């Protein structure tokens, strides 16, 4: 092979049409080579892989964190409990008001205030559970982004060719 990239083959002159150097997007040791010299490869074929144990573990960790966040965001236990509490509080307050209407001052003002406070507290618990759900959904979105980033980093450990050709 001549220094200008040409090779002489018994009566024929072969010239390289495209000579490409393909760089890895991450630093590291090559752990796997997917071709042999002289082999034809298609565009976007994976030529080699860099050692990626740490990147793979980051993807697994991010997947677990994402799954956990999705589970938290989809849980409605807190909201259901708050709604049940509100239903009970409203029923108790309504019974006390009915009793006071039927028999004047049968329920003390202090008890009526306590029942109203309990009802208001239950309403606030519903608002709080809704806010918690919104925050949990944002957390799930954040974890999804972290998973995507970890997967992108892992993908950068694969060295692919932009063109078809012979290696």
Residue ranges of each PLM-predicted region?
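Long, charged alpha-helical "stalk" segments
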Residues: 1, 36-112, 127-150
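Hydrophobic alpha-helix/coiled-coil detector that fires on Leu/Ile/Phe-packed helical surfaces
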Residues: 2-6
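Short, solvent-exposed beta-edge and connector elements
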Residues: 9-11, 15-37, 42-47, 161-167
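A glycine-/polar-enriched beta->alpha junction
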Residues: 17-20, 124-131, 152
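Short amphipathic alpha-helical coiled-coil/interface segments
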Residues: 115-123
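Long, amphipathic, non-transmembrane alpha-helical coiled-coil-like segments
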Residues: 154-157
């Amino acid at each position: 092979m001549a220094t200008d990239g040409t090779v002489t083959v018994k009566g024929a002159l072969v010239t390289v049409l495209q000579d490409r150097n393909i760089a890895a997007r991450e630093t590291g040791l090559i752990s796997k080579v997917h071709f042999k010299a002289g082999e034809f490869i298609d565009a976007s074929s994976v030529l080699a892989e860099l050692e990626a144990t740490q990147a793979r573990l980051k993807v697994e960790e991010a997947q677990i964190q994402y799954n956990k966040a999705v589970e938290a965001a989809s849980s409605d236990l807190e909201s259901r409990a708050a709604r049940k509490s509100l239903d009970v509080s409203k029923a108790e307050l309504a019974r006390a008001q009915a009793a006071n209407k039927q028999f004047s001052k049968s329920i003390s003002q202090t008890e009526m205030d306590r029942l109203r406070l309990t009802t208001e507290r239950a309403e606030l618990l519903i608002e709080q559970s809704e806010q918690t759900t919104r925050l949990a959904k944002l957390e799930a979105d954040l974890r999804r982004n972290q998973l995507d980033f970890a997967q992108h980093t892992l993908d950068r450990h694969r060295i692919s060719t932009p063109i078809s050709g012979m290696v």
